[in-house]
Regions:
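Proteolytic maturation boundary segments
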Residues: 1-17, 25, 160-285, 443, ...
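Peptidyl-prolyl cis-trans isomerase
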Residues: 169, 177, 365-366, 422
Length: 537
């Protein structure tokens, strides 16, 4: 299809008062280039450098200096005939988006003055190389990429040129595309603000013409679900009503899993796979919400967020640079039943990546400034959840299934009250009491041998103190004797969220796996499930 780049003759600013929004959001969009255009690679580097990480000009200005938002994202999105370079940020409550826009252009001026170094460029390209191989790590990924190259580049073999283009970007390219597509160029600005807070939108914005569906009670269309839908079928060269015969059962080659338990009690499980030069790992430390005080829910979530914000000997920015320079990613997060440290790295850098994991795990920095930022970000997320139907449903459903007094009935992030009551000492207490190798499992898959894995864990095994962790005895969950219907009203909601369920099997139950297969076929398998087919088809 013929390329049709967008040309703006003026900057356009529009706003919209959202009935359900809790926080103001600003989007800035510049016309850019289509997928696989020679400039798209430098634009992706530019977006990453400007917005991602502690060193990013946008992060430094909007998050750290001006404290207008918890995060800011920027990305280059290329399609078949055109593309867009987009910035998005959700500001804190009652923040004037004019101040946010002003801070954005202040950050861009900083970039104009300082540019991008070879070191930072190498760091970003290392991450992009890892992402490239990640996209090829499954059969689905390979098929999707080859199809995408055929459609957008006209040749599936472009896969080989794509990675070369990623690695060929220079600092001069990044400056050039900034000057060509961003600096002094017209853009589209959209301000989405809570109802009756139009003053938070950018000045000189016009009201967007958004047609809202009117919800009229009792006006729903009536239909008989027993009547099969009729529709005109697409012509076919063969009779699709005749089901083809089943072929032979596939010969599934289950990968070999090796196991080892280290002297500290740390359990290790691994699969060696050399198809792509990557290693992925996950360290699961049992606990999470299970070990929290009901009056201070959110401790494990905040702790996980703080673990990757520097170490004893590395500032947050230094740690981030060390990770990204390896083409790696290391994330920490909490779940209802664990605190998890996961990672993804080039195989050649696996040992160096695990050395950083050891620092993160055993030498936390405990920086008050970072704790305050994470706390503020969490409070902002909790506020946003109030406008998210799925979050509302999940929170209400957990209370009904587990009961008000069960620890798992709580939102993992906590509430405004509980998060505000948490101090950094609460995190230190959880860390010193509940983080132990004796309740930890390490899973690793990739181009790495068992001996290399155990060697990478030797320092963690030697230096991590094992302790007895006491888990609370949870009340037994009871299945309701009769079906019950609960309704949570969101006035003016445009859609409904339905949840059906009851307390069921533990993951250790012998029927758990058969039940997951049953559930997949019944309703959990997307378009392969009977429920979806009944509702959609």
């Amino acid at each position: 299809m013929k390329k049709q780049p967008v040309v703006l003759i003026e900057t356009k600013k529009v706003y919209y008062e959202d009935n359900f929004a809790r926080l103001p959001q600003l989007n800035l969009t510049w016309p850019s280039v289509y997928q696989y255009h020679k400039d798209s690679y430098a634009l992706k580097v530019l977006a990453t450098y400007l917005s991602k990480g502690k060193k990013a000009p946008l992060y430094k200005t909007l998050v750290e200096q001006e404290q207008l938002t918890a995060s800011v994202s920027m990305f280059q999105s290329g399609s078949e005939i055109a593309g867009e370079f987009m910035l998005r940020t959700t500001a804190f409550s009652n923040t004037d988006l004019d101040e946010v826009e002003k801070a954005v252009f202040k950050a861009l001026l900083d970039f104009e003055a300082n540019g991008i170094s070879e070191t930072d460029l190498s760091r970003i390209k290392a991450g992009q190389e890892t992402d490239f191989y990640n996209s090829l790590s499954s059969v689905l990924g390979k098929g999707a990429k080859l199809a995408q190259y055929e459609i957008f580049a006209g040749d599936a073999a472009f896969i080989n040129q794509d990675v070369k283009n990623i690695l060929a970007v220079t600092p001069e390219d990044v400056i050039r595309v900034y000057n060509t597509y961003i600096k002094g160029k017209h853009y589209v600005a959209t301000s989405f603000v809570p109802k009756n807070q139009a003053t938070l939108a950018l000045q000189n914005s016009t009201l967007a013409n958004v047609v809202e569906e009117k919800i009229i009670e009792g006006a729903e269309e009536q239909f008989d679900a027993s009547i099969a839908a009729t529709y005109k079928k697409t012509p076919s060269s063969f009779d699709r009503s005749i089901e083809p015969p089943y072929g032979e059962n596939p010969d599934v080659k289950v990968p070999s899993v090796w196991k080892e338990e280290l002297s500290s009690g740390l359990g290790v499980f691994g699969i060696e796979n050399n198809e792509v030069p990557l290693v992925q790992f996950q360290m699961q430390i049992k606990g999470g919400l299970l070990l929290e005080d009901a009056n201070k829910v959110g401790v494990s979530n905040l702790l996980a967020g703080l673990l990757t914000k520097g170490t004893k000997n590395k500032t947050p920015e230094q740690l981030e640079n060390a990770i990204e320079s390896l083409g790696a990613s290391i994330n920490a997060y909490a779940t209802n039943e664990s605190v998890v440290i996961s990672g993804n790295t080039l195989a050649k850098n696996y040992a160096k990546t695990m050395a950083l994991v050891k620092e993160i795990l055993l030498e936390p920095r405990w920086e008050e400034k970072e704790f305050d930022l994470i706390k503020q970000s969490t409070l902002s997320q909790i506020e946003q959840q109030k406008a998210n139907p799925n979050s509302i449903a999940a929170n209400a459903y957990a209370k009904l299934v587990y009961g008000e007094n069960h620890i798992l009935s709580n939102n993992l992030s906590g509430t405004e009250k509980s998060v505000n009551s948490i101090s950094i000492d609460d995190l230190k207490q959880y860390y010193s009491t509940n983080m132990s190798p004796s309740i930890t499992k390490f899973h690793v898959v990739g181009a790495v041998t068992a001996s290399e894995v155990t060697a990478s864990l030797s320092d963690i095994n030697d230096d991590w103190e094992s302790k007895d962790v006491t888990f609370p005895v949870l009340p037994e969950l009871k299945t309701p004797e009769n079906s019950q219907v609960y309704f949570y009203n969101v006035p003016g909601a445009k859609q409904s969220v339905l949840r059906f369920g009851y307390p069921a099997l533990a993951a250790t139950d012998t029927d758990y796996y058969p039940a997951t297969i049953m559930n997949y076929r019944l309703g959990g398998g997307g378009f392969a499930s009977q429920l979806t087919q009944q509702l959609r088809e």
